[in-house]
Design a protein with these regions (language model features):
Chain B
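Short, ordered "entry" segments at domain starts
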Residues: 101-240, 245, 270-377
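Eukaryote-specific, low-hydrophobicity, charge-rich regions
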Residues: 246-276
Length: 286, 377
């Protein structure tokens, strides 16, 4: 039997050229589809992540500013105004830090009752924080009611109230004992500023304790152009530049992604931007 | 033989399509799940913010509810005594819990926890708020036992004194400051055996006694009235009790509280802490009996005899007294055209009676400044 002769039932080993070409075409087409799908999904993934990050920045930024400003006290015509300076992209104010009730006062010390009536994210800090103690010599009259600002002259110490319960002893000076009912309201505050600050070439919402040490620290960002916009309104809803007249604050935060995101249409270099606006009602304004 | 060859041929023709497809599906599924996770995180963040806001609103409702439904019983809670109130649902998924702590000088600290509940009733968000409150004591310009915008005429055998005097047998009164006997925008005229004494005895032609000195506290207190009585005659005011165990009967319009204290006879102790604000939009004639608190009369007040009252009397019309046995311990303010105190009455200035009448009868309001507090517990 000649070697070149193939019987009808001889097994067919290998592929024909057409089969190979067909297989390669199918392979390339499938691989291209998979690659395109992966690219698409990767873009979607990155865009979604950037958008989520930008929105989280917006939410946390606006909540931070709103929470800080909501508790601000303001009295039209002056008096007990906690807004010290107001601008379109910064605000300086007394930020409330602790609250509770006194259990003992003397000329140079205020003891704050610890326990469930005391509230604060951190302990008072000397110099940086100040005391606000409610004075009301004549409880039958509101005309002498006032929060008296006193310095904190030493680190607060653990102590006891006259009844033996735990207290926080805060050193101060210039307190006129007869002006206070004990127990009575007490607060602490620090002078704060919120403003735009730059770090690593990016803009952030920064916070700085003006009564403490240290500079402006970025807390939320990155923000886009005009990242923090504040409009101050009086009781009639008109914008005002007088701190004591402010009743509401319109707050706009504009966020920006960390890096450019390729758009689904193929565009390159677009930075995701988003914004959130809300109105903060000053709960202690009158 | 032929079947074996065909099987071998099929094995040889296996391609990469299935493997590639599986790999592609896995990669795509991973990417989709990544996007899904990112979206879930974003949505969870948004939901969290909404729930936190709802919890805050529940806490706000708790603050407002306490002020709207203030009970004068809170005014006498023990100092430092935390008073926790039952939790209240706000809508289908909100809840607040209040704790009220009394301080001195008529001040309170209200703490409220607001919860947002999930479908199974579990807490999914909590916020804490607080508010400093004070008793809504109106600004009362009391510088004398009797304050009148018009002239004061004292006759008969009356005794008006501005020296601070506690009601008989009352205990726990802080020392007060002596005031004038009578203070008037016109003249104070005493006839017969009448006596007007104090520090000073009289303040006459006081131009500061304008309408608002009388109408401002009148209108404020009127809004907190315990008893609103039509104009007319009222006789024999007596403290009464009801129920078992017995308690002061606030539903009885002739029960104006118990000013007497032991060892006086017939003291109704259940009503010693009852200081009603009695308001009449018309004119009143009162005759015999006793009471305490704040008496507000928009018209004229005529006290005819044997009527004892501890607290504050504000009359926007004229005040006239007659007969014997009348006694007011506290302060009287009259804006009307004439004040004629004749017969055999006594009017004693009492800082203690004034303070108790106010502190036991008024509701609370937020401190004027820095009352609202964001708390962490």
């Amino acid at each position: 039997m000649p070697l070149t002769t193939r019987s009808a039932d001889h097994p067919r080993a290998g592929f024909t050229l057409v089969e190979m070409l067909l297989a390669m075409i199918i392979f390339v087409a499938t691989a291209s589809l998979i690659y395109a799908s992966m690219r698409l999904m990767e873009k979607v993934h990155r865009t979604g992540g950037e958008r989520a990050g930008a929105q989280i920045t917006l939410r946390s930024g606006s909540q931070t500013v709103a929470a800080e400003l909501r508790e601000v006290n303001n009295v039209d015509g002056g008096g007990m105004s906690d807004l010290i300076a107001i601008n379109g992209n910064s605000v300086t104010y007394w930020a409330m830090r602790n609250s509770g009730m006194t259990c003992q006062v003397s000329n140079n010390e205020v003891r704050i009752k610890k326990g469930p009536t005391y509230s604060g994210y951190r302990l008072p800090i000397m110099i940086r924080d100040s005391l606000l103690v409610f004075a009301d010599r004549d409880s039958l009259s509101v005309t002498d009611d006032q929060w008296v600002q006193l310095p904190i002259l030493g680190p607060p110490q653990n102590s006891t109230c006259p009844d033996g319960s735990p207290a926080l002893a805060v050193g101060t000076a210039g307190l006129v004992v007869a002006d206070y009912h004990v127990p009575g309201p007490v607060r602490t505050f620090e002078l704060m500023q919120l403003a735009i600050t730059t770090s690593g070439g990016r803009q952030y919402l920064g916070a700085q304790s003006l009564s403490g040490s240290g500079g402006m620290e970025p807390v939320v960002g990155p923000l886009g152009a005009g990242g923090l916009q504040l409009v101050y309104r009086n009781q009639f809803g008109a914008s005002t530049t007088t701190p004591s007249s402010v009743r509401t604050i319109d707050l706009t935060v504009r966020s920006q992604g960390y890096r450019p995101v390729t758009t689904l249409g193929g565009g390159v270099g677009a930075m995701l931007r988003d914004s959130l606006a809300l109105r903060v009602l000053l709960r202690n304004a009158r | 033989m032929r079947r074996a060859r065909l099987t071998a041929l099929r094995r040889d023709e296996r391609g990469l399509a299935l493997v590639l497809s599986l790999i592609a599906m896995v990669v795509i599924a991973a990417l989709i799940s990544g996007v899904f996770v990112a979206s879930r995180q974003e949505m969870a963040g948004g939901r969290s913010a909404v729930r936190a806001t709802q919890a805050t609103e529940a806490a706000e409702a708790g603050l407002n509810d306490m002020l709207a439904n203030w009970s004068v019983a809170y005014n006498t809670y023990g100092i430092y005594g935390d008073s926790a109130f039952p939790s209240v649902m706000v809508g289908p998924s909100g809840r607040y819990s209040q704790v009220l702590t009394r301080m001195r000088g008529g001040k309170f600290l209200l703490r409220v926890r607001g919860d947002q509940l999930g479908a199974s009733g579990n807490v999914i968000a909590t916020r804490y708020l607080g508010r400093y409150l004070r008793l809504a004591i109106p600004d009362l310009d009391i510088q004398a036992a009797v304050t009148a915008q018009d002239g004061v005429t004292a006759g008969g055998n009356i005794d008006i004194t501005g020296f601070d005097t506690n009601p008989p047998n009352w205990t726990g009164c802080a020392p007060g400051i002596n005031k004038a006997g009578a203070r008037s925008g016109q003249a104070v005229t005493a006839h017969g055996a009448s006596s007007v004494i104090g520090s000073p005895a009289e303040i006459e032609f006081d131009s500061t006694l304008v309408d608002s000195v009388f109408t401002s506290p009148f209108n404020t207190l009127k809004g907190m009235a315990t008893l609103t009585l039509p104009g007319g005659s009222y006789t024999g005011m007596t403290p009464t009790v009801t129920g078992s165990p017995s308690r002061c009967n606030g539903a009885n319009t002739l029960n104006w509280g118990e000013p007497f204290a032991a060892p006086a006879a017939g003291v109704v102790t259940q009503c010693q802490g009852y200081f009603p604000i009695i308001y009449s939009p018309g004119s009143m004639v009162v005759n015999t009996g006793r009471g305490q608190g704040i008496l507000l009369v928009a018209g004229d007040l005529n006290i005819q005899g044997n009527f004892i009252f501890d607290g504050i009397v504000i009359v926007l019309g004229s005040l006239q007294t007659a007969g014997t046995g009348n006694k007011v311990t506290g302060a009287v303010l009259t804006a009307g055209q004439s004040v004629s105190i004749v017969g055999n009455p006594d009017v004693f200035y009492s800082s203690c009676a004034i303070a108790r009448a106010l502190q036991y009868s008024v509701r609370a309001e937020p401190l004027r400044d820095r009352s609202w507090v964001q708390r962490v517990n």
